[in-house]
Amino acid sequence: MRVLGRTGLKVSSFGVGGYHAAVPKEEAESIALVHRALELGVTFFDNADCYQNGVAEERMGKALEGRRKKIILMTKVDQRDAAGSLKTLERSLRRLRTDYLDIWQFHGIRSLKDVDQIFAPGGALETAEKARKEGNIRFIGVTGHADPQVHLAALKRYPFDTIQMPINVLDPHFKSFRKTVADEAVNRNAGVIAMKTLSMGKILSYRVATVAEALPWVWSQPVSVLVSGCESVEQINYNVYLAKTFTPMPEDEQATLLARTEPHKGTQVEDYKRSPES
């Protein structure tokens, strides 16, 4: 278990990504996947209002029913205004079958305009702070994967409890969140949530690294929890196995791995880092 920054929450080092958990065609498969994660001791569950047009939240809500107090539940909102974000929050609570969220994050900030909209009068931050006072959410976070400078700008404007970003074996070579944001987040006591840990599977399909190399490298960075998309019970089993057998990767091994991955840097594999204009 690791501590999620200033929240003080103790979380499993591996977290289930909500988007991929809802990929299986049959709902029963998604529920079985979540139940298996629970059996193995996973306590952190990621989601977003927009994932699979709401199906991801609905399936996770069914799977976690009766187990809510044993886990840390996070979801995200894309709307930047107060009114729209309030409707989204209410919808997420209904789908997830809960009356509160442990963490609610502003989803996918890509530009300073996004940040300005969230903080503007009538912006989504107003909804988040009101919901926190009323007990509908416990902590406020922010996510994004396009530009580390936007993450830094958000951190400097508000004491976010959590911040979610791409951290993987390619990230240090190009528009790096690990080098630019992660340490600053830790200095500000924000819980760091790693995502895109396999670059949406492209680290595997491009043969950049194996899962057994890629995930331990991420856990060796200053992260509280690694979120990875799993679409089968077998993938859950293997990822949790890696989490439970993890030992910090020596610096020389990290350097060797990064030297090997460097030729793959850029947006061909990390395509989510393309600028908003491209």
Task: Report residues per predicted region.
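Glycine/proline-rich, positively charged
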Residues: 80-169, 173-177, 186-193, 234
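Acidic (Asp/Glu)-rich catalytic clusters
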Residues: 5-11, 38-39, 61-69, 90-99, ...
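Active-site mouth loops of central-metabolism enzymes
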Residues: 17-28, 74-84, 115-117, 203-209
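Active-site beta-loop-alpha junctions enriched in small/polar residues
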Residues: 19-21, 48-50, 76-80, 106-109, ...
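N-terminal binding-site loop/beta-alpha segment at the start of enzyme catalytic domains
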Residues: 1-71
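Short catalytic-loop micro-motif centered on adjacent basic/acidic residues
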Residues: 43-51, 74-76, 138-142, 164-165, ...
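Conserved, mostly hydrophobic/aromatic
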Residues: 4, 16, 45, 60, ...
